[in-house]
UniProtKB/Swiss-Prot annotation:
Belongs to the peptidase M17 family. It is an enzyme of class 3 (hydrolase). It comes from Chlorobium luteolum (strain DSM 273 / BCRC 81028 / 2530). This is Probable cytosol aminopeptidase. CDD domains: Peptidase_M17. SUPFAM superfamilies: Macro domain-like (SSF52949), Zn-dependent exopeptidases (SSF53187). InterPro entries: Leucine_aapep/pepB, Macro_dom-like, Peptidase_M17_C, Peptidase_M17_leu_NH2_pept, Peptidase_M17_N. The keyword Protease applies. The keyword Protease applies.
Length: 508
């Protein structure tokens, strides 16, 4: 998708769709001039309440506008950045359905309601349009599509990829530079989120640990940051017992990918981001029920978010050093797979009783967290993981669970969540939960007694941060791959990319 900003008159804009955002506050007063310019009455406003994400498509009278359609889209009463993102997502999704490839967002229609500022709104609109226009159809052959034209060369169905080719923002002339700046950063962040979504949506037979490593390496090569990939022999020599144990049942070797973005000027801080990279989680010997197992291709969403965040940070040239760490494997049942009751030794030297092989994510994260703390001594460690179904039970599909041993870090993450709309809710790390993960035969168990499953998982991870004083764990099990109808998107959402980038920008 290309972007542009303009201050041309409405009548001069050549587009497939003109989009007018309106607040629910003072709707009729703001919308009437737009409808008049399109040769329409106020009557359609009876069907449009302008709640965030509401849309209404109308058809101008001939000769009034060059665009064949206009759309009213609601930004709610508050007009927050989250509301603007919802508006852009809904508008872009509807535009794709209408096959409108050139769209214009008219910000003056908002009547000065772009409260967060033109630059921030422009950035959010681009991110939202990329989000709403996204379709994952790369694995469709098109052979069963009806009515498609055949190519002369191969006689196969030829279908244009769905999407938006050009997004233009119409702004006042005085705001042109701010709009262009915001659109540029929005394109970077939105594209990084889209890349993460593509990775999450790939099925297990198309994405293995090696493919995650290749994706990180390709990003590093293109955007100028270092990537090192440790493979099975190196992982074994480092005695990363958690990653090795989870991989035992797999035919595909594990990888441990290290991304290292170093700014050109002296870094203001060093932040370690750790992403869980389980490319498919069958549960191992403690096998999952068949219902919904196909969605376990998304168990590497934390890894995808970390790759996206590091990529965006590099492209935005943030003045913070970022270490991205991704332990990756699938979790499969096999004669050689780890078994319930096994005791393994992690990279830290801490021994773990495997109470359940389906609690595998915390085992590979244990190695990565200790590695991050000991090798890099970062100013903060943040891990993202689709760790527990218990987090979905507690918070649903639109909110991630947040745990931290540092109030300032937790507050910064909560602030970034408010700014981006990628919602988090902090849960406790009280010592009393340690009782639930005690083991009689090892230092700790990877499963807890009944109840508080998302908390006991976080308490397990806490034991592997090597005493680090500034650590946060974000359980993204719900929002990374929402159930159908549970959120504004189906499939992989790329949750965490925008959250992390906003956090890193504020850090700098």
């Amino acid at each position: 998708m290309k972007t542009a900003a303009t201050f041309s008159a409405l009548q001069d804009l050549d587009a497939d769709l003109l989009i007018f955002p309106f607040s629910s506050e003072g709707l009729k007063k703001a919308a009437s001039p737009v409808l008049e310019a399109a040769g329409l009455s106020d009557a359609p406003l009876d069907d449009f309440k302008a709640a965030a994400g509401d849309t209404l498509v109308l058809y101008p009278r001939p000769g009034k506008l060059r665009a064949p359609r206009v759309m009213l889209v609601g930004t709610g009463e508050a007009g927050s950045l989250d509301d603007w993102h919802r508006a852009a997502t809904a508008a872009a999704s509807r535009a794709v359905d209408l096959e409108a490839r050139r769209i214009v967002f008219d910000l003056p229609a908002a009547g000065g309601k772009a409260k967060p500022g033109i630059e921030a709104v422009a950035e959010t609109l681009v991110e939202g349009c990329l989000f709403g226009a996204y379709r994952f159809e790369r694995l469709k052959s098109g052979k069963l599509d009806k009515g498609e034209k055949k190519t002369a060369a191969k006689g196969k169905a030829k279908k244009a990829e769905k999407g938006i080719d050009l997004l233009t923002l119409r702004v006042p002339a005085s705001a042109l530079a701010a709009a262009e700046k915001g659109m540029a950063s929005g394109l970077v962040i939105g594209s990084a989120q889209e890349m993460a979504r593509n990775l999450v949506n790939l099925p297990g037979n198309h994405l293995q640990a090696e493919d995650i490593a290749r994706a990180a390496a390709a990003s590093g090569k293109q955007y100028g940051y270092g990537v090192t990939v440790l493979r099975k022999k190196e992982i074994e020599s480092l005695r990363m017992g958690g990653l090795v144990a989870v991989n035992q049942g797999s035919l595909n070797p594990p990888t441990f990918t290290v991304m290292d973005y170093v700014p050109k000027k002296k870094a203001k801080a060093t932040i370690a981001l750790v992403g869980k990279g389980v490319t498919f989680d069958s549960g191992g010997i403690s096998i999952k029920p068949s219902e919904g197992m196909g969605d376990m291709k998304s168990d590497m969403a934390g890894a995808a978010a970390v790759i996206g965040a590091v990529e965006a940070a590099a492209r935005l040239a943030l003045p913070v050093r970022i270490i991205g760490l991704i332990p990756a494997t699938d979790n499969m049942p096999d004669g050689n797979a780890q078994k319930p009751g096994d005791v393994i030794t992690t990279y830290s030297g801490i021994t773990v009783e495997v109470g359940n092989t389906d609690a595998e994510g915390r085992l590979i994260l244990a190695d990565a967290l200790t590695y991050a703390a000991q090798k890099y001594s970062p100013d903060a460690i943040i891990d993202l993981a689709t760790l527990t179904g218990a987090c979905i039970v507690a918070l649903g599909y639109q909110v991630a669970g947040l745990f931290s041993n540092d109030d300032a870090l937790a507050g910064a993450i909560e602030g970034a969540a408010r700014d981006t709309g990628e919602k988090v809710w902090r849960l406790p790390l009280w010592e009393l939960y340690d009782e639930q993960i005690k083991s009689d035969v090892a230092d700790v168990s990877n499963t807890g007694s009944r109840g508080a499953g998302t908390i006991t998982a976080a308490k397990f991870l806490e034991k592997f941060i090597d005493g680090h004083k500034k650590w946060a764990h974000i359980d993204i099990a719900g929002p990374s791959f929402p159930a159908k109808g549970a959120a504004k998107v189906n499939g992989g959402s790329g949750f965490g990319v925008r959250l992390l980038v906003e956090l890193l920008r504020k850090w700098s």
